[in-house]
Amino acid sequence: MGSEMCIRDRRQGERLAHKIMRERPDHDIDVVIPIPDTSRVAGQALAHELGVKFREGFMKNRYIGRTFIMPGQTQRRKSVRQKLNPVPLEFEGKTVLLVDDSIVRGTTCQQIIQMARDSGAKRVYFASAAPPVRYPNVYGIDMPTASELVAHGRTIEQISEHIGADWLIYQEIDDLIECSREGNSLVDGFELSVFDGQYQTGVIDDAYLTGLSDARSDNSVDRADGALVGLHNRS
């Protein structure tokens, strides 16, 4: 399974590179820098296809988990800064293409882009190895509500502006499918609801999603966190 995932990630990087060359054949990318760790293979393949350098520009604190599933926006913002430390030498005076496996809330990439700028990057582009995540997951991953997803209701240009990137590119959903299907004749379909909003089980309706939204929303989590802090301070 690990080798299959590695091959899939490599294909995703290659497909992204091909899309970049179609959209920006005269691109000015100096270096590709992955967001550790899950985008490393895709980033290497992307850099190779573009014929540019691949560099590790962030040092990772491995005691901090995935930020997009952390409860509360305050905790996520704090954790991003604790999790990654930039290496200024890899950014100074360069046009950098940052690569991540996906963009969910936008909290992580927003801060990482600012880190790159603070480290001296001339321009900061951002590439997502997955298509825009526009809909909530209802099958076990504690992802945010639709309104908290940065891609929900926004165009690519609006997302780029929101996260502070000079340019943003996403994987095409058809390319993602082909990256996973290629070489595996047993695969004939995928669960893509976070990208296209088409849930495989018929019980997912507006009422269900509204209830899920109320339970998962950042506001409710932050209020609960605040209540716990207040209780602790009074004890």
Regions found by a protein language model. Give the residues of each.
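PRPP-associated nucleotide enzymes
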Residues: M1-S235
